């Protein structure tokens, strides 16, 4: 069995799945496996009384806004109140991508490709919590979690009739926005578009478009959590993630829905990488990312396909088992990430929280968003950093010292 352990101040072991090969036998990519493990952990949150929010289906079939299998997409909405009654936070769900017919067909049998399999209620924790002691700046906002069932970060617009696949992420995005505007978002005086992992990438891709939905008087910003996927070589020198993204962009007809400010001078696959977008964006953006992102270590840097000898097997699952040479390689990845955000961080309107943890997605989990023992940089937790930036209380450009200096991390270990 696969166990996910949270190592740091909190240690927990939770059985979550089966061995990697069994996942591959069931036509799910390793990328989806890691997403399932890490998002699955939130179901075992230490929050003893979490807010449960019901699923609302979006009646967008007439416009073609459907999941991979043709079912209706959906979202979870918890209404704001008091000073937050006209403030809106839209959280885009993550969950990997599908880059070929086989993996997309598999997703049709899961919540990542069909609303038939989506949870009818979800816990709202972290940035979605309704408790001031857990979510000090956004607890009373209208908070929405838009479910992810297209496999291309809400960006595709095509179909494959032979496989009965609908690639309609872009239409899902538009139908959801229209539905939320009709439900009061059109009157927002403050708005934040956020997302985790594949949803964090989507928040970057859609950020400027989101800004344009509102009048100039509305305060609009964006937040990407664990969405800074780097166009980097794997341990064999190959381009695992570029090949993956190329498949997604080609299969799902993503090209025409990418920001024109990028596609007017770069190829579409390059424009699916945040590093080619973030410095050109007009809307203020905050990036939260672990410098040693466990998803990228396991699925981009050292996937099993790039490591046939198994030399990286132990290290990719547990940083405590990395050799000095492997740690140097991972330090190089951190340095590449810092180079990518250097120009972006020069803009006063942008914000940054890059901690030296082995983690992935830190805003929806209560223990990493805002708790007594949350990860901190210069004594500032993620929730406080994001709030200070959004409300212009302070300029926030927080970059951690390299591993292993940060003792506040909630590092993930897989066994």
UniProtKB/Swiss-Prot annotation:
Domain of life assignment: Eukaryota
Q: Which family does it belong to?
A: Belongs to the pectinacetylesterase family.
Q: What does this protein do?
A: Hydrolyzes acetyl esters in homogalacturonan regions of pectin. In type I primary cell wall, galacturonic acid residues of pectin can be acetylated at the O-2 and O-3 positions. Decreasing the degree of acetylation of pectin gels in vitro alters their physical properties.
InterPro entries from the xrefs?
A: PAE/NOTUM
Q: What name does the UniProt record give this protein?
A: Pectin acetylesterase 12
User: From what organism does this protein derive?
Assistant: Arabidopsis thaliana
The record's subcellular locations are: Secreted, Cell wall
Query: Where does the chain cross the membrane?
Result: none
- Pfam families, alphabetically? PAE
Q: Which UniProt keywords apply?
A: Cell wall, Cell wall biogenesis/degradation, Glycoprotein, Hydrolase, Secreted, Signal
Tell me which Gene Ontology terms the entry assigns under biological process.
cell wall organization
Residues annotated as glycosylated: 27
Its GO CC terms are: extracellular region
């Amino acid at each position: 069995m696969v166990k996910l352990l949270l190592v740091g101040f909190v240690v927990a072991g939770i059985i979550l799945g089966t061995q990697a090969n069994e996942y591959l036998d069931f036509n799910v990519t390793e990328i989806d496996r890691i997403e399932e493990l890490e998002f699955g952990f939130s179901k075992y949150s230490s929050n003893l009384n979490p807010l449960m929010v019901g699923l609302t289906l979006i009646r967008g079939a007439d416009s073609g806004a459907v999941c991979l299998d043709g079912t209706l997409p959906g979202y979870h909405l918890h209404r704001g109140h008091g000073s937050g009654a006209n403030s809106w936070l839209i959280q885009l769900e993550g969950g990997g991508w599908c880059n070929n017919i086989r993996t997309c067909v598999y997703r049709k049998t899961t919540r990542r490709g069909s609303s038939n399999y989506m949870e009818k209620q979800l816990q709202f924790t972290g940035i979605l919590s309704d408790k001031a002691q857990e979510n000090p700046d956004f607890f009373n906002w209208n908070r929405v979690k838009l479910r992810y069932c297209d496999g291309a970060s809400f960006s595709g617009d095509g179909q494959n009739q032979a496989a009965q696949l609908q690639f309609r992420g872009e239409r899902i995005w538009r139908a959801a926005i229209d539905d939320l505007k009709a439900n009061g978002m059109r009157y927002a005086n403050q708005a934040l578009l956020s997302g985790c992992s594949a949803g964090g990438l989507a928040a970057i891709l859609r950020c400027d478009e989101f800004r344009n939905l509102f009048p100039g008087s509305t305060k609009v910003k964006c937040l990407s959590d664990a969405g800074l996927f780097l166009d980097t070589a794997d341990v064999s020198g190959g381009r695992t993630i570029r090949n993956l993204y190329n498949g997604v962009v080609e299969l799902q007809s993503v090209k025409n829905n990418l920001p024109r400010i990028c596609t007017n001078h770069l190829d579409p696959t390059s424009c699916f990488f945040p590093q080619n977008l973030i410095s050109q964006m007009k809307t203020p953006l905050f990036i939260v990312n672990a410098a040693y992102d466990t998803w990228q270590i396991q699925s981009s840097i050292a996937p099993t396909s790039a490591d046939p000898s198994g030399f990286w097997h132990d290290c990719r699952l547990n940083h405590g088992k990395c050799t000095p040479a492997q740690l140097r390689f991972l330090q190089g990845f951190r340095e590449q990430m810092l180079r990518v955000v250097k120009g972006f961080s020069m803009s006063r309107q942008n914000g940054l929280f890059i901690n030296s943890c082995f983690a992935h997605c830190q805003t929806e989990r209560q223990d990493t968003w805002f708790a007594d023992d949350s990860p901190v940089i210069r004594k500032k937790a993620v929730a406080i950093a994001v709030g200070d930036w959004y409300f212009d209380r302070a300029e926030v450009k927080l970059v951690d010292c390299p591993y292993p200096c940060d003792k506040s991390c909630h590092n993930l270990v897989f066994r």
